[in-house]
């Protein structure tokens, strides 16, 4: 078979496979070059007798993620709802508090005002940021030069609000608040639909999973493309100096095409040599954007014992000593293979990597026993984990984050073509970037950029809106009148201060009128 094709796709994750499928469906010849011995990229479904199947990488889908839902349905996949029937748990200062809804409730009135102001402020700031061009926000540079830690120090007045906000950042982007740009993080949350949508299970980003695992999306596209998908072919050189693009792999194979789609995380572009060299901004961008740190952990039990205690399996866990910050029930929809999924996030992933797998499991079980107040948590029947930080062809998970100052300086070139190279990957999406949904959007957009380049579609068809999924409809995210209008803590203090001044002035005036002042 000839190594010549119309398009070479570098990277066989969901983004690259979605791009390849669209081009293949349009009659173009495509070759996918994947470095690993499997497709799927940052999605990874393993199968064995202890788990049946389990997603060790990207897994969750939900309402408003219409592209991945449409593609998966076309490939014959179905979703099921992540269990949230029973109560959730918020574990803080050594105690467990049951709750329902997306956010743990707050009983202290000052903390309540502070929490309410935090979520409201982040959403309001997000509204100022264009999803497709965050560097065009009115205060882009001011916000980009600030870390999320600095922003939270400005917004939050109470320690408990700052702690839950820090957990929120850690969970959303697997990085520390001092590591990420405020502009980038606020954009990230905004393009996922806001603070409530991104964090929620029901009606949110974690509502559903695929029966059989998310790895099937890439695997089924591979079945369609057949031997056009080449595994264990790390790309080491892309040469655009001739009429066609020449792509060389680590095992000394040479492929030739009219166009290339790079569907790998931006930082992995550092593993490839380019002729001619990349333009300055692209060349520097790829050395400045790391990926987050996370170990995904699945603890299996004989049965979902937490449900008997009226807990759904979702735990929001605060505290430096806790290895896991967030869990979800990962039991199969028929109740078999009972499991709790937990994330070891950011600096904790870097700290706990020093332990053995068995030591990490013990720490997790001891934590779950404490939070759930159950000795059954100490009796796991199986354990799976995946440390994405050690994956040389990912560099981390879930996604690339932008440190302060990078987005405004380099963001414009994120998906800007370089000659005949077009860029996909979830990082280049404008909606649910960082998720499987963003991967599909980016892959299909890059494919349509090539269709436009060869004259098959007009430019205004490169970006296409996606109809809402009929199977997974989205309910609007609403807020109450009080949530919208309650003052912040400093607002309340100002109000008290003003009230005090007005009261004192009024009393003084009355006293003066009635001659109550003592005259010296």
Swiss-Prot record:
InterPro entries reported in the protein's UniProt record: Amino_oxidase (IPR002937), FAD/NAD-bd_sf (IPR036188), Flavin_amine_oxidase (IPR001613), Flavin_MAO (IPR050703)
Bilayer-crossing regions: 490-516
Ranges per topology, Cytoplasmic: 2-489
Residue numbers on the Mitochondrial intermembrane membrane side: 517-520
Site (Important for catalytic activity): 156, 365, 382
Membrane topology summary: Single-pass type IV membrane protein
Protein name: Amine oxidase [flavin-containing] B
Organism: Mus musculus (Mouse)
């Amino acid at each position: 078979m000839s190594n010549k094709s119309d398009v070479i796709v570098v990277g066989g994750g969901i983004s690259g496979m979605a791009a390849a499928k669209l081009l293949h469906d349009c009659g173009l010849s495509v070759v996918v070059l994947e470095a690993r011995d499997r497709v799927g990229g940052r999605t990874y479904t393993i199968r064995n007798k202890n788990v049946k199947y389990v997603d060790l990488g990207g897994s969750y889908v939900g309402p408003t993620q219409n592209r991945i839902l449409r593609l998966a349905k076309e490939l014959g996949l179905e979703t099921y709802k992540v269990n949230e029937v029973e109560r959730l748990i918020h574990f803080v200062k050594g105690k467990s508090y049951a709750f329902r809804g997306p956010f743990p409730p707050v009983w202290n009135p000052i903390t309540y005002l502070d929490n309410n102001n935090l979520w409201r402020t982040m959403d309001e700031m997000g509204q100022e940021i264009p999803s497709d061009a965050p560097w065009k926000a009115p205060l882009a540079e001011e916000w980009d030069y600030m870390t999320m830690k600095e922003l939270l120090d400005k917004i939050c007045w109470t320690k408990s609000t700052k702690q839950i906000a820090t957990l929120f950042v850690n969970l959303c982007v697997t990085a520390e608040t001092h590591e990420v740009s405020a502009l980038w993080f606020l954009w990230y949350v905004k393009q996922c639909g806001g603070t409530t949508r991104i964090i929620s299970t029901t009606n949110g980003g974690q509502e559903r999973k695929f029966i059989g695992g998310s790895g099937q999306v890439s695997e089924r596209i591979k079945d369609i493309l057949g031997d056009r998908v080449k595994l264990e072919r790390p790309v080491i050189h892309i040469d655009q100096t001739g009429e066609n693009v020449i792509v060389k792999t680590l095992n000394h194979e040479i492929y030739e095409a009219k166009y290339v789609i790079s569907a790998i995380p931006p930082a992995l572009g550092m593993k490839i040599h380019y002729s001619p060299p990349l333009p300055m901004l692209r060349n520097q961008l790829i050395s400045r954007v790391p990926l987050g740190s996370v170990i995904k952990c699945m603890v299996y039990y004989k049965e979902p014992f937490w449900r008997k205690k009226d807990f759904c399996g979702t735990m929001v866990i605060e505290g430096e000593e806790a290895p896991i910050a967030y869990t979800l029930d990962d039991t199969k929809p028929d109740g078999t293979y009972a499991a709790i999924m937990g994330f070891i996030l950011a600096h904790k992933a870097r700290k706990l990597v020093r332990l053995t797998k068995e030591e990490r499991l013990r720490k997790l079980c001891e934590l779950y026993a404490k939070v759930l107040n159950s000795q059954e948590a100490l009796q796991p029947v199986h354990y799976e984990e995946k440390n994405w930080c050690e994956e040389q062809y990912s560099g981390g998970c879930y996604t690339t984050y932008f440190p302060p100052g990078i987005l405004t300086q380099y963001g414009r070139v994120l998906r800007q073509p370089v000659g005949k190279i077009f860029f996909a990957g979830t990082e280049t999406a404008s909606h649910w970037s960082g998720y499987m949904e963003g991967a599909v959007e980016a892959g299909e957009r890059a494919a349509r950029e090539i269709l436009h380049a060869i004259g098959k579609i007009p430019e205004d068809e490169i970006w296409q809106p996606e109809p809402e999924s009929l199977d997974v409809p989205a309910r609007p995210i609403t807020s109450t009148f009080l949530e919208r209008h309650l003052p912040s803590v400093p607002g309340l203090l100002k109000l008290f201060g003003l009230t005090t001044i007005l009261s004192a002035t009024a009393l003084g005036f009355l006293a003066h009128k009635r001659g109550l002042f003592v005259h010296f």
